[in-house]
């Protein structure tokens, strides 16, 4: 057995033809990141730029750096601001500046240690530095663990919309240390639970039922470690299966945008940073659930089950007061628009969805009227 194999970790393959990688859950966690990088084929002696934010770097930065040094890497730590309002080209330029100062080469590595914003910006910086260097994702929020860190989507926001500037850039490794959730603010944990619920709706009715059976969903301290790891594993497996079959969102991967079309409108019109991404997605899922009822795609009972589970997770379910015409205008600028037509992921039952390009503006107006 290889000296770099961690027998206690759960390993989920992301089976891409050109660059397969693993999502590793548990094991030694951040203490074993250096070993896991060696196992993934990264050579000792290479320069590593670890990008993090202050709230994460304080408890975990030194631990990560020590593990990297013990495995023969040469790490440097960069601490950045990581609110959604900081997810801009200017912030990525700061990472580029640090890469220049650290003299990163094409064989060097960037490591994202933090939540989804850190992961998105670091991934995009890696994709664009020297026309692309390797990146590793070390997610420390629930949302990043189950969604943002897996699949290679990177990017930053534009005043006209969320994630309009970006690239697909797959990581060499995703390492999930569930113990980092102990220091995660409860609001952030709840936001991540929105993405977990999403997986239940789009393709895993058993996961949805599992979540329905849990009495307390809104804080990690209420979940037994084994149950938490099961939720992480099922969610990561759901994401990896979709990404493995459709890396660049040519077809099936679009189902991962469930709740995001309306959710991105909420983020854009309410201002980045006023809602956490997962909170906006939760509102978006409730909204598209109502749209599905109006289209008779699924039952009112299914819509109510979804809304109840979202509420139990401590997430918002009320649509904010927004001008319907502004909503329609913002939807038209969404990157998921195809041939000028609005594209939505519509649920047809718990565990099943369809991608629809025929949603009319009048249907959206009626849906917004029902929500308000």
Swiss-Prot record:
Source organism, top-level taxon: Bacteria
Gene3D superfamilies: 3.40.50.1970, Dehydroquinate synthase-like - alpha domain
A Gene Ontology cellular-component term: cytoplasm
Pathway the protein takes part in: Metabolic intermediate biosynthesis; chorismate biosynthesis; chorismate from D-erythrose 4-phosphate and phosphoenolpyruvate: step 2/7
Cofactor details (free text): Binds 1 divalent metal cation per subunit. Can use either Co(2+) or Zn(2+).
Chain residues that bind NAD(+): 116-120, 140-141, 153, 162, 180-183
GO molecular function: 3-dehydroquinate synthase activity; metal ion binding; nucleotide binding
Uppermost EC category: lyase
GO biological process, one term: aromatic amino acid family biosynthetic process
Cofactor(s) this protein cannot do without: NAD(+); Co(2+); Zn(2+)
Subcellular location: Cytoplasm
Keywords from the named record: Amino-acid biosynthesis, Aromatic amino acid biosynthesis, Cobalt, Cytoplasm, Lyase, Metal-binding, NAD, Nucleotide-binding, Zinc
Positions contributing to Zn(2+) binding: 195, 260, 277
Catalytic activity: 7-phospho-2-dehydro-3-deoxy-D-arabino-heptonate = 3-dehydroquinate + phosphate
InterPro entries hit by this protein: Dehydroquinate_synthase, DHQ_synth_AroB, DHQ_synth_fam, DHQS/DOIS_N, DHQS_C
EC number: 4.2.3.4
PANTHER family in the record: 3-DEHYDROQUINATE SYNTHASE (PTHR43622), 3-DEHYDROQUINATE SYNTHASE, CHLOROPLASTIC (PTHR43622:SF7)
Function: Catalyzes the conversion of 3-deoxy-D-arabino-heptulosonate 7-phosphate (DAHP) to dehydroquinate (DHQ).
Family classification: Belongs to the sugar phosphate cyclases superfamily. Dehydroquinate synthase family.
Official protein name in the record: 3-dehydroquinate synthase
Species of provenance: Prochlorococcus marinus (strain MIT 9313)
């Amino acid at each position: 057995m290889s000296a770099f194999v961690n027998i206690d970790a759960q390993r989920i393959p992301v089976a891409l033809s050109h660059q397969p990688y693993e999502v590793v859950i548990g094991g030694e966690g951040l203490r074993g990141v250096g070993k896991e990088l060696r196992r993934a084929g990264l050579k000792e002696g290479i320069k590593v730029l670890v990008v993090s934010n202050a709230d994460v770097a304080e408890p975990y930065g030194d631990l990560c750096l020590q593990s990297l040094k013990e495995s023969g890497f040469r790490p440097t730590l960069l601490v950045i601001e990581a609110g959604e309002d900081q997810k801009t080209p200017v912030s990525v330029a700061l990472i580029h500046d640090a890469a220049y100062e650290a003299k990163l080469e094409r064989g060097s590595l960037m490591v994202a240690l933090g939540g989804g914003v850190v992961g998105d910006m670091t991934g995009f910086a890696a994709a664009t530095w020297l026309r692309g260097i390797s990146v590793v994702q070390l997610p420390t929020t629930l949302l990043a663990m189950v969604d943002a860190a897996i699949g290679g989507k990177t990017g930053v926001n534009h005043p006209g919309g969320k994630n309009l500037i970006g690239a697909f850039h797959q990581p060499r490794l995703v390492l999930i240390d569930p113990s980092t959730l102990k220091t995660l603010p409860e609001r952030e944990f709840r936001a991540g639970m929105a993405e977990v619920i999403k997986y239940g709706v789009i393709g895993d009715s058993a996961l949805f039922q599992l979540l329905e059976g849990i009495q307390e969903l809104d804080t990690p301290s209420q979940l037994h470690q084994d149950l938490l790891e099961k939720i992480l594993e099922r969610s990561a497996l759901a994401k990896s299966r979709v990404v493995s079959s459709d890396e660049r969102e040519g077809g099936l991967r679009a189902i991962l945008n469930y709740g995001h079309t309306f959710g991105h409108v909420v983020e854009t019109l309410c201002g980045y940073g006023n809602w956490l991404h997962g909170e906006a997605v939760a509102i978006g899922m409730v909204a598209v659930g109502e749209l599905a009822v109006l289209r008779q795609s699924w039952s009112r009972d299914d819509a109510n089950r979804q809304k109840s589970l979202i509420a139990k997770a401590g997430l918002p379910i009320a649509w904010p007061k927004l001008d319907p015409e502004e909503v329609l205008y913002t939807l038209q600028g969404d990157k998921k628009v195809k041939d000028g037509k609005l594209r939505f992921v519509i649920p047809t039952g718990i565990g099943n969805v369809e991608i629809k390009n025929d949603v009319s503006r009048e249907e959206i107006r009626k849906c917004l009227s029902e929500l308000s």
